[in-house]
A protein has these predicted regions:
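Signature of extracytoplasmic/envelope-associated structural regions
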Residues: 1-224
Length: 224
């Protein structure tokens, strides 16, 4: 909750009391990357898959791409409703939540980690509901199932990596007789970047960097 000062002239030496302002709903969610929850996050950031292909045996190939249009007026991507129970009587419900940032990171001795930054419109206190948890698979993606290729060729030089997606989304306040944000919209294009640590064993990638050579970066994780 924002606070703002009251500025006026009065016969006192102290400043007047401040007042409560805009109620902002923002935060990050971090979790080990399981296939099904990860799918919700990908949809939340990129929208519905551009293509879905059945691979048989309950396996599917989903292709997500940077969106070319907003989900709706005042909602750049599909909104979600989140319920958070902190073991204190009731649950906190956050409505109109959109996923702004998305991060995947991996390194040895660590599962694939996912972090999502969210922006919401409103919050309320509701009765606790009973969630249904994913029953299979019971383990997240592990580092020892990860393989990486650059420009179509497998490489063992990558020691750690982080994939970042920034939707550049923010809540927009207005004079609408409420402390909630009026709408949520983009302030710029969706940005995708990759960072990490690479074994500097030769000058191949250094030369590609100097020449600004564009290459395909493919990350593969498998899960039974």
């Amino acid at each position: 909750i924002d606070r703002f000062d009251i500025k006026n002239i009065g016969a006192i030496y102290t400043e007047p009391d401040d007042m409560s302002g805009l109620r902002r709903i923002e935060g990050n969610i971090e979790f080990p990357a399981f296939p099904k929850p990860l799918g919700h996050c990908l949809r939340g950031v990129f929208g519905n898959p551009s293509s879905i292909t059945s691979l048989g045996s309950s396996l599917w190939n989903n292709v997500f791409k940077t969106p070319t249009a907003d989900f709706s007026a005042g909602q750049p991507v599909a909104p979600y409703t989140f319920e958070v129970f902190r073991d204190v009587t009731s649950s906190f419900q956050y409505a109109g939540v959109v996923m702004n940032t998305f991060q995947l990171s991996a390194q040895p001795n660590q599962e694939l980690r996912c972090s999502v930054g969210v922006v919401g419109k409103s919050t309320s206190v509701v009765n606790k509901t009973s969630p249904t948890f994913v029953s299979s698979p019971v383990e997240p993606f592990s580092f020892d199932t990860c393989s990486i290729s650059i420009a179509g060729g497998a490489t063992a030089l990558i020691e750690s990596f982080t994939l970042n997606v920034d939707g550049q989304i923010q809540g927009i306040p207005a004079l609408n007789a409420t402390t909630a944000v009026a709408k949520i919209r983009r302030t710029g294009p969706q940005l995708v970047s990759i960072s990490g640590t690479m074994d500097f064993s030769d000058l191949t990638e250094y030369s590609n960097f100097l020449n600004q050579t564009e290459q395909a970066f493919v990350l593969n994780f498998t899960k039974a």
